[in-house]
């Protein structure tokens, strides 16, 4: 009898030990290229995060980046790549694009990789409907031959990647209806030129829409937002140091309008705190309006025609204290991802129409990858169709 009791006790203890050992593996898995080749890999994925070391961390080749895939059940799958400051991760339908300093990866019914010229800094990425493929734009630096600054563009055309050189430094960019819009410095360095670069055809074509002179000390605070009528960008310091304005540029006429959006207490700490925590995703168009999320988490709704502005809701004050914050918009929803070292991460879903929080998901194992010693920065978040 005693032997049976001892045997049962040992089996129970072994089961507990096995549970403790296996459970962490269920909640965080390191995946390889071979795993990504599985046609079913994306089936249960809901959220995609992109973390990378910065360019200076990669000065001697030691930089890293991670694509973190979060499944419906909360399992985190981490795919390690080389580093790329300001790199992107993009989702379109059942397709995913990832990148590092040497390679572009696409995942759709398996994995494909494309080796390309070394890049140290990303700019933006998206999807071209007419070519049924992704594009990605890089801030490539000065040409080694001394021909000036260059930004390199890679586009998926007929299933292959095509490289083009845009001979400008791009301060901000946006995408709409097959065209990339780029804000580039004027030759005298006292203003910006707005270019329309048609990117959904084999040969790039350029159209200069207008030039806009800015006040010394003014700063661009967002990427470009674009709709059928105009191109928009947020600036600060054009009229006053503590005032954010929306620049609206008519696509056809090139006419420039400035609209006051948000004014803050004129002290350095308040102004610094007001700066958007996401240059890439803090400003976007939706349903006849523009939305701007400032550094305090206030969501400003701006009428695209009149510039009339109102604060429609504020992101969770507790979550705004997080060390890592990023946002993304998909349809009528705004998604807010937050993470603080050694704690669970969260993603919240807000309705742009009502301002109400609709959903919150805890992501427990980001802390396994993103630690103080990892020196990683958060550069992108994407919500997949299963969220």
Swiss-Prot record:
Entry keyword set: Signal
Position of the signal peptide: 1-27
Protein name: Uncharacterized protein YycP
Native organism: Bacillus subtilis (strain 168)
Name of the gene encoding the protein in the UniProt record: yycP
Gene3D superfamilies in UniProt: YVTN repeat-like/Quinoprotein amine dehydrogenase (2.130.10.10)
Top-level taxon of the source organism: Bacteria
InterPro entries on file: Quinoprotein_ADH-like_sf, WD40/YVTN_repeat-like_dom_sf
Alphabetical list of SUPFAM superfamilies matching this protein: Quinoprotein alcohol dehydrogenase-like
């Amino acid at each position: 009898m005693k032997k049976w009791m001892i045997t049962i006790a040992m089996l129970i203890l072994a089961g507990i030990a096995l549970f403790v050992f296996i459970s962490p593996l269920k909640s965080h898995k390191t995946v390889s290229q071979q795993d990504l080749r599985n046609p079913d890999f994306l089936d249960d994925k809901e959220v995609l995060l992109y973390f990378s070391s910065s360019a200076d961390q990669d000065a001697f080749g030691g930089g890293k980046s991670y694509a973190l895939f979060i499944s419906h059940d909360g399992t985190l799958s981490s795919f390690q790549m080389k580093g790329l400051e300001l790199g992107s991760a993009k989702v379109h339908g059942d397709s995913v694009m990832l990148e590092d300093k040497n390679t572009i990866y696409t995942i759709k019914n398996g994995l494909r990789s494309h080796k390309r010229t070394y890049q140290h800094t990303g700019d933006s990425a998206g999807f071209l409907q007419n070519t049924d493929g992704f594009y990605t734009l890089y801030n490539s630096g000065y040409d080694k031959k001394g021909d000036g600054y260059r930004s390199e563009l890679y586009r998926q055309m007929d299933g292959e990647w095509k490289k083009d050189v845009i001979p400008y430094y791009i301060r901000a960019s946006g995408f709409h209806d097959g065209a990339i819009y780029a804000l580039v410095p004027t030759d005298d360095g006292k203003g910006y030129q707005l270019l329309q670069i048609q990117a959904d055809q084999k040969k790039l074509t350029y159209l200069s829409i207008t030039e806009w002179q800015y006040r010394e000390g003014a700063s661009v605070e967002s990427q470009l937002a674009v709709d059928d009528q105009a191109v928009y960008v947020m600036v600060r310091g054009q009229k006053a140091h503590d005032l954010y304005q929306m620049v609206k540029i008519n696509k056809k006429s090139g006419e420039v309008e400035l609209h006051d959006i948000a004014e803050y207490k004129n002290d350095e700490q308040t102004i610094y705190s007001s700066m958007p925590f996401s240059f890439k995703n803090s400003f976007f168009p939706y349903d006849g309006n523009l939305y701007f999320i400032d550094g305090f988490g206030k969501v400003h709704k701006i009428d695209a025609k009149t510039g009339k502005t109102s604060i429609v809701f504020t992101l969770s004050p507790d979550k705004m204290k997080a060390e890592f914050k990023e946002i993304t918009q998909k349809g009528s929803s705004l998604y807010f991802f937050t993470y603080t070292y050694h704690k669970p991460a969260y993603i919240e879903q807000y309705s742009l129409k009502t301002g109400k929080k609709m959903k919150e998901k805890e992501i427990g194992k980001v802390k396994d990858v993103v630690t103080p010693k990892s020196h990683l920065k958060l550069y992108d978040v994407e919500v997949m169709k299963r969220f």
